[in-house]
Amino acid sequence: MNKLKFLSFLIAVICFVTPIGAQTVNKTGATVNNYNYNDAFSPLFYTKNGNNYRSAGGQPGPSYWQNRADYKLSVRLNDQTNEISGTEIITYTNNSPDKLGFIWMQLDQNLFKSDSRGNAIIPPTGSRNGARGQQFEGGYTIKSVKLISIEKVKTIESSVEFLIEETRMQIYLPSALAAGGGQLKLKIEYSFISPDYGSDRMGILNTKNGKIFSVAQWYPRMCVYDDVLGWNTLPYTGPSEFYLEYGDYDISITVPSNHIVVSSGELTNPQDVYTLEQQNRWKAAAQSDKTVIIRSASELADPKSRPSGKQELTWNFKLKNARDAAWASSAAFIIDAARMNLPSGKKSMAISAYSIESDGIDAWSRSTEYTKASNEFNSKKWLEFPYPAATNVASVAGGMEYPGIVFCGASAKSGALWGVTDHEFGHTWFPMIVGSNERLFAWMDEGFNEFINSLASTDFNGGEYKPRTMDMHTLGKIITNEAFEPVMSSPDNMKERNIGVLAYYKPALGLTLLREQVIGPDRFDRAFKTYIERWAYKHPTPDDFFRTIENVAGENLNWFWRGWYINNWKLDQAVTDVKYVKNDPVQGALITIENLEKMPMPVILEIKTKSGKVSRLKLPVEVWQRNKQWTFIYPSVEEIVSVVSDPDKVLPDSNSSNNSWTLGK
């Protein structure tokens, strides 16, 4: 999802949240120490042992399984009524050890029914969820659900019983689907009216040359059946995103002939939908590291820029091993593209589709450059981009990700456009490759993605949009405010205004702290990359992530997971005293530090002596493993004039007032 709204929110929080930096005092005015090292470092962190499905070391176990859903989708867009109608054929494979007497499907469009559960909980103003009050006949019309079977070489379609409950559909099977590879085929006919604004994930943008349809959650999708919860059937109410099975997609999209369609996957019939000149431009773009214009702004009003002779054209796309698909269609599209160079030597395409209103040298004319750079960086750093194309669409949606295609705000420019483009394509790795449960654990895709965005932004174009360094002490006061729920909350279970901090920034900040202050970049990057490789195209849980980082890095981090992710613990480190061995500075200094709040962290001290010499000292987090207060000997040779804790403000210390000791004060 779009992080730009979150950044605006964070600025508002910084401006308006009441500071909480003051330390806790009792009725007599004495400082209260809230730290409990037994709570922080308790060895009882994991609630279950490893098993054949998920190992204790964080790997998929030898008997790990997941089900599969392959889709053949054929839809038609009516750009006058905004109706999308279609047929899907699902091939569902049950690799679980359980027989399944019924299956569950997701009907996300039903969020936009007037009587939906999601609509009932959307506030009247200030929410990005729902359809922003649009009055229309939203939701799916399910025309038929049939089971396809083959009998004596003849295809038989049999109607099956089904029940629709809000954004879910339960289909009752005439006989149980066998475990360990049992397979069925379903055929569903359906239609829906696209909302103008679809919960910031899809919708319709009006431009002077026509509507831009950004189409997502556009077909009934299989729910995930896994070894953790069985059927994952939490309803779609808006705040939480998705949890989906992997499979192959065969997509046919029929639209008015003056439209251009971009989609997840690879276009397989360019000769039917592009002019000969445009086909040649595509070939040139596939060999170019610079952006090549496929359809220019000046051609938008030229009927020769579209194939003639038909009222409608059908666009065919294919996509392998993906968890979803989305597409966009418009007569208003300017199209440009360039090749992407991947570490293995393979090539992919960076593509942009936008209206003339979004065009400009500081705007969407750089979109393909941004798309190419973001995906090439992450491919080199983590795991190779897996899709034949990466398409950026100027959309009514502020920012939303799908496999090989993203929707970004049509008015974004310069750093804002880089930021949203990099963020949405960063989702290729989380959750498109690493298929975590977004509905329960948004921080495992938004937060992880926000973290890799910070590295990509630092790298891009010599630091053109390098993130500014933020004062972690100020952030520490904000993100541990008692108004925030723990990170380990689902978006459905936190205030909407808190999602930006809890799903995006705080979990990303946690990874940065681990990388820069706890583990070190080399060990952390190796562990993080291992997590991606282990769980590529699989379904990890938080425990799988925690265990992988610990096992690969070789560190027990339960104190960190417990304080930063499971709870909302504050950090407050203090320098409380400086004395000398036998009252002689030449024999060494006795420096006392204290941890006053529940979160432990390593200690960084800057020590300045009388001659002006300044030195740095770092103490491991283990000093707090059995101590609230710690005194250590510093090898001084002269009098110390000051000791400062965390001088560079790289730790989220919520109270800076006690971070320094100064001689004579």
Q: What function would you assign to each model-found segment?
A:
Residues 21-22, 31-56, 68-69, 317, ...:
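Hydrophobic alpha-helical and helix-loop surface patches within well-folded domains
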Residues 88-90, 94, 107-109, 182-196, ...:
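Short, hydrophobic/aromatic-enriched beta-strand segments in well-ordered soluble domains
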Residues 262-263, 573-574, 580-646:
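Beta-strand-rich binding/interaction modules
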Residues 25-106:
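Early extracytoplasmic/domain-onset interaction patches
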Residues 115-132, 191-249, 270, 649-665:
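Glycine/proline-rich low-complexity spacer/linker segments in large multi-domain proteins
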Residues 100, 104-153, 254-259, 608-618, ...:
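Solvent-exposed beta-hairpin/edge-strand motifs
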Residues 24-34, 74, 83, 93, ...:
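A surface-exposed beta-strand-loop module
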Residues 220-229, 237-422, 451:
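Hydrophobic helix-coil surface modules that form long, contiguous segments used
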